[in-house]
Amino acid sequence: MRIAKVRGTVVSTYKEPSLQGVKFLVVQFLDEAGQALQEYEVAADMVGAGVDEWVLISRGSQARHVRDCQERPVDAAVIAIIDTVNVENRSVYDKREHS
Amino acid sequence: MRIAKVRGTVVSTYKEPSLQGVKFLVVQFLDEAGQALQEYEVAADMVGAGVDEWVLISRGSQARHVRDCQERPVDAAVIAIIDTVNVENRSVYDKREHS
Amino acid sequence: MRIAKVRGTVVSTYKEPSLQGVKFLVVQFLDEAGQALQEYEVAADMVGAGVDEWVLISRGSQARHVRDCQERPVDAAVIAIIDTVNVENRSVYDKREHS
Amino acid sequence: MRIAKVRGTVVSTYKEPSLQGVKFLVVQFLDEAGQALQEYEVAADMVGAGVDEWVLISRGSQARHVRDCQERPVDAAVIAIIDTVNVENRSVYDKREHS
Amino acid sequence: MRIAKVRGTVVSTYKEPSLQGVKFLVVQFLDEAGQALQEYEVAADMVGAGVDEWVLISRGSQARHVRDCQERPVDAAVIAIIDTVNVENRSVYDKREHS
């Protein structure tokens, strides 16, 4: 999985029928120190993440093991909203300090 | 998924039998600000996107969860025609301004 | 999928039993203008493409949806021999001009 | 698979229900000489690896063939804790020298 | 698939139970001219390749279609030991000249 930050949304009315009701978020990947990378993805969000929240993104066919996405053509999904990231016993991110 | 712009078509008569009737589009990936990237893909299109339209592309085995593609060897598909893209509450793209 | 040009062959006698009879082609990926990229792949060929022909390559688990490859450990396959490639209403490639 | 070193943890309370009880590790990929690469991944850990241990990471849909992960949306998992790495008959890593 | 050269081994005692008896090889990818690339992978080997042999590597979920790997979390596998590689009717590699 990858760590990412929610940056925006994509809206589409004309789409695969199975995608009705699926929310699409624009997410930007972060490195292990929390620095933004020049890498973006559009991910299906069934967890309910908000802009600026840190999330875990799962990609490829595994993305469909998110609730209600089994038969949907999504190749990236938000699987968790991150509380904390620790690297070498140092806190890189703590959600409480960002709310 | 990735944001892309439709740029052209690929036509093939001599192909896997299961691909009869599948339309192939040449798409160019865009970054989150709508700038063209030097990355192209050929995607199966069951949604009916036109040249210059912004679309969402799903890749890998998930591409086959598009209608009628279950048993087809496609690894990239158009899953939606994009209406709007918003990043940090700023409109990056609105289809109505491009029609 | 990706556009590629057939460049050569790989032969192997000592291999997974399920691969008996599968032909392996060395293909070089092309960009949307038909320029050769420094990216190669070895693809299973059930379509019968020849050296210098332009082909469509499908990669990942989708490659096995090519005829007779369901249970074979191939992660790249030729799915079509290309007739034409058009980008922004300009012909990039036409097979008849290359035969 | 890829060789990696465990560098930290990610904790999330608000996540896909199927992910309850799954431990997430931040791992950094290493090259064949054991040098750290600027590539990070978050992997599910069902093996019980500790910080600084060298591990084998499997990615993509194969990651779910780890115990208890069949229906979980994980796209990267720790599949083994490495004892030794040898390249060209030279020892690159031996766990006993690092405990 | 990718062409690679066997460079070494990884040994692990503490691993996913399903991986008992699986041999892990360190392989280095080669370009179409046989030049070594700075890209390494650890692949499961059910074919019995030796150090310095040229092999074909299949990656992603297709790797599990190698014998006895159906339910194993391997995302890369040796599927063939290469006899010859020809590019543009020129011999790039012939196993007999290397034994």
Curated annotation (Swiss-Prot), chains A, B, C, D, E:
Q: Where is this protein found?
A: Carboxysome
What are the GO cellular component annotations? carboxysome
Task: Give the recorded use of this protein.
Answer: Heterologous expression of 12 carboxysomal genes in E.coli (ccaA, ccmK2, ccmK3, ccmK4, ccmL, ccmM, ccmN, ccmO, ccmP, rbcL, rbcS, rbcX) leads to the formation of bodies that resemble carboxysomes, have densely packed paracrystalline arrays and RuBisCO activity. These structures open the door to generating carboxysomes in plant cells to increase their photosynthesis and productivity, as well as tailoring bacterial microcompartments to specific metabolic needs and molecule delivery.
Q: What is its main location?
A: other
Entry-linked PROSITE patterns: BMV
Q: Which family does it belong to?
A: Belongs to the CcmL/EutN family. CcmL subfamily.
Deletion phenotype: An insertion in this gene leads to rod-shaped carboxysomes and an inability to grow in normal air, called a high-CO(2) requiring phenotype, HCR. When ccmL-ccmM-ccmN-ccmO are deleted no carboxysomes form, cells are HCR and RuBisCO is soluble. Both mutants grow on 2% CO(2).
The UniProt keyword set, sorted, is:
Bacterial microcompartment, Carbon dioxide fixation, Carboxysome, Photosynthesis
Q: What is this protein called?
A: Carboxysome shell vertex protein CcmL
Expression induction per the record is: Carboxysome size and components vary with growth conditions. When grown in ambient air at medium light (50 uE meter(-2) second(-1)) there are 7.4 units of this protein per carboxysome, the numbers are stable under low light, and increase under high light and high CO(2) (at protein level).
Describe the protein's quaternary organization and the partners it interacts with: Homopentamer. Interacts with full-length CcmM.
Function per UniProt:
Probably forms vertices in the carboxysome, a polyhedral inclusion where RuBisCO (ribulose bisphosphate carboxylase, rbcL-rbcS) is sequestered. Has been modeled to induce curvature upon insertion into an otherwise flat hexagonal molecular layer of CcmK subunits. Beta-carboxysome assembly initiates when soluble RuBisCO is condensed into a liquid matrix in a pre-carboxysome by the RbcS-like domains of probably both CcmM58 and CcmM35. CcmN interacts with the N-terminus of CcmM58, and then recruits the CcmK2 major shell protein via CcmN's encapsulation peptide. Shell formation requires CcmK proteins and CcmO. CcmL caps the otherwise elongated carboxysome. Once fully encapsulated carboxysomes are formed, they migrate within the cell probably via interactions with the cytoskeleton.
Task: Identify the InterPro entries for this entry.
Answer: CcmL, EutN_CcmL, EutN_CcmL_sf
What are the residue boundaries of the BMV domain, all occurrences included?
Answer: 1-83
Swiss-Prot/TrEMBL GO biological process terms: carbon fixation; photosynthesis
Record the organism.
Answer: Synechococcus elongatus (strain ATCC 33912 / PCC 7942 / FACHB-805)
Question: Record's Pfam families?
Answer: EutN_CcmL (PF03319)
